[in-house]
Amino acid sequence: EPLCRRQFQQHQHLRACQRYLRRRAQRGEQRGPALRLCCNQLRQVNKPCVCPVLRQAAHQQLYQGQIEGPRQVRRLFRAARNLPNICKIPAVGRCQFTRW
């Protein structure tokens, strides 16, 4: 886990993924440049760390207070869990983490 935290920091806290997740949670937007950049960032992360860093990215959005209400929180975490599939990252598939 400390290794994954370090990866999270090395890859600019997956900023593009955070941007994508925020838009997805707030407006349900699925496309756009943030997604492409996010997938590029995710592909550079060690496979075992993909889900942990996505969980961190989702939490970062929560802490920044950008996500409002249970519906947006649900959408945020659902989107984060699905990103490895959307980005077609081999051998990761859907992340299993829950909100905490």
Curated annotation (Swiss-Prot):
<dbReference type="InterPro" id="IPR000617">
    <property type="entry name" value="Napin/2SS/CON"/>
</dbReference>
<feature type="disulfide bond">
    <location>
        <begin position="39"/>
        <end position="87"/>
    </location>
</feature>
<comment type="similarity">
    <text>Belongs to the 2S seed storage albumins family.</text>
</comment>
<comment type="subunit">
    <text>Heterodimer of a small A and a large B chain linked by disulfide bonds.</text>
</comment>
<dbReference type="GO" id="GO:0045735">
    <property type="term" value="F:nutrient reservoir activity"/>
</dbReference>
<feature type="disulfide bond">
    <location>
        <begin position="17"/>
        <end position="38"/>
    </location>
</feature>
<dbReference type="InterPro" id="IPR016140">
    <property type="entry name" value="Bifunc_inhib/LTP/seed_store"/>
</dbReference>
<keyword id="KW-1015">Disulfide bond</keyword>
<feature type="disulfide bond">
    <location>
        <begin position="4"/>
        <end position="49"/>
    </location>
</feature>
<dbReference type="InterPro" id="IPR036312">
    <property type="entry name" value="Bifun_inhib/LTP/seed_sf"/>
</dbReference>
<comment type="function">
    <text>Heat stable 2S seed storage protein having sweetness-inducing activity.</text>
</comment>
<protein>
    <recommendedName>
        <fullName>Sweet protein mabinlin-4</fullName>
    </recommendedName>
</protein>
<feature type="disulfide bond">
    <location>
        <begin position="51"/>
        <end position="95"/>
    </location>
</feature>
<dbReference type="Pfam" id="PF00234">
    <property type="entry name" value="Tryp_alpha_amyl"/>
</dbReference>
<keyword id="KW-0708">Seed storage protein</keyword>
<keyword id="KW-0758">Storage protein</keyword>
<keyword id="KW-0776">Taste-modifying protein</keyword>
